[in-house]
Curated annotation (Swiss-Prot):
Location(s) in or outside the cell: Cytoplasm
Gene Ontology MF terms in the entry: D-ribose pyranase activity; intramolecular lyase activity; monosaccharide binding
Chain's gene name: rbsD
InterPro entries xrefs: D-ribose_pyranase (IPR023064), RbsD-like_sf (IPR023750), RbsD_FucU (IPR007721)
Active site residues according to the UniProt entry: H20 (proton donor)
Pfam families membership: RbsD_FucU (PF05025)
Family per record: Belongs to the RbsD / FucU family. RbsD subfamily.
Subunit structure: Homodecamer.
Keyword flag Membrane: no
EC top class named in words: isomerase
Pathway listed: Carbohydrate metabolism; D-ribose degradation; D-ribose 5-phosphate from beta-D-ribopyranose: step 1/2
Functional note: Catalyzes the interconversion of beta-pyran and beta-furan forms of D-ribose.
Catalyzed reactions per annotation: beta-D-ribopyranose = beta-D-ribofuranose
Name of protein: D-ribose pyranase
Amino acid sequence: MKKHGVLNSEIAAVLASLGHTDTIVIADCGLPIPDGVKRIDLAVEIGKPSFLDVLQVVADDMAIEKVTLAEEVINNNAEVNKEIELKLIEPAFEYVSHEQFKEHTKKAKAIIRTGEATPYANVILHAGVIF
């Protein structure tokens, strides 16, 4: 049994398979998941698990080069936006419209659906390298 890091076998497998610039999405429970993109559904009830809890665990186990967020999060969920900025200090940040964000999710290796039920609590994580 693993002692640390991501214990969820599906998430661990996706993280292990990422190459430089590949993307994964951590999403609230309302983000549409495009056909053909791997869905890892963690939602058990509204709010559980939280977006920020899942983000923290994934970020601790992933080299992240860039982060993409919907620009709407700035005005509609400033608290989550601030927490993302505090948790992810190193990567570059990019803000796009929510419609563009949804288009970008079509290229993700996986979308991790949380129980989060606050507006625009979604992030695209772009894989970096560890060297």
